[in-house]
């Protein structure tokens, strides 16, 4: 697009990337087994497999204690670095993004409309239930746009929100859209996955 620069493109950290970020610090968790169980319940096993690791092997390191878990997380970190571009994109991921004039806010899964943007913390990844509560302009943004919804219900547009989740990765479609600064959809594609 005319006038675009590379910095205009922002990659958002999704729930899986947030779980991976926390997995790399598992040795610091007070109850690493409980934390890892939660991560497994939230599908981190696919990421482990992608880097040549397994749930069973990870559990063995956790059982061996903090030092063994630290060695394992360092090994996983090194495996990520060995894959060209993987570490670079993980470093570049942003919690949220907004247009220069503050018209549009882009998030992974949700927000808590009762909190300012700087206090959202985990709501960006786990705030699905609050997203549907947005029935007025949030913090001056014309639209809040998210790309993940637990039910993968497709494209949903309300006066103040947009959801783009056709279930990509779950047998559905990959949804993408281009918005003007008023939050109106000017182009949209849907690709079977």
Which residues fall in each region the model found?
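Feature recognizes metal-dependent phosphohydrolase scaffolds
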Residues: 1-193
């Amino acid at each position: 697009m005319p006038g675009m620069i590379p910095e205009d493109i922002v990659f958002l950290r999704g729930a899986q990337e947030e779980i991976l970020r926390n997995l790399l610090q598992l040795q610091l968790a007070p109850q690493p087994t409980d934390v890892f169980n939660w991560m497994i319940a939230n599908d981190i096993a696919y990421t482990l497999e992608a880097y040549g690791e397994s749930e069973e092997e990870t559990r063995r390191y956790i059982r061996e204690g903090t030092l063994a878990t630290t060695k394992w997380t360092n090994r996983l970190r090194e495996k990520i670095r060995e894959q060209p571009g993987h570490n670079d994109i993980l470093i570049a991921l942003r919690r949220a993004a907004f247009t220069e004039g503050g018209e549009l806010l882009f998030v992974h899964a949700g927000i808590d409309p009762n909190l300012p943007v700087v206090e959202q913390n985990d709501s960006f990844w786990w705030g699905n239930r609050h997203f549907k509560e947005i029935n007025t302009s949030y913090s001056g943004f014309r639209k809040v746009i998210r790309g993940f919804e637990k039910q993968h219900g497709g494209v949903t547009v309300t006066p103040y929100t947009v959801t783009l989740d056709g279930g990509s990765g779950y047998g559905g479609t990959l949804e993408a859209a281009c918005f003007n600064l008023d939050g109106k959809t000017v182009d949209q594609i849907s690709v079977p996955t």
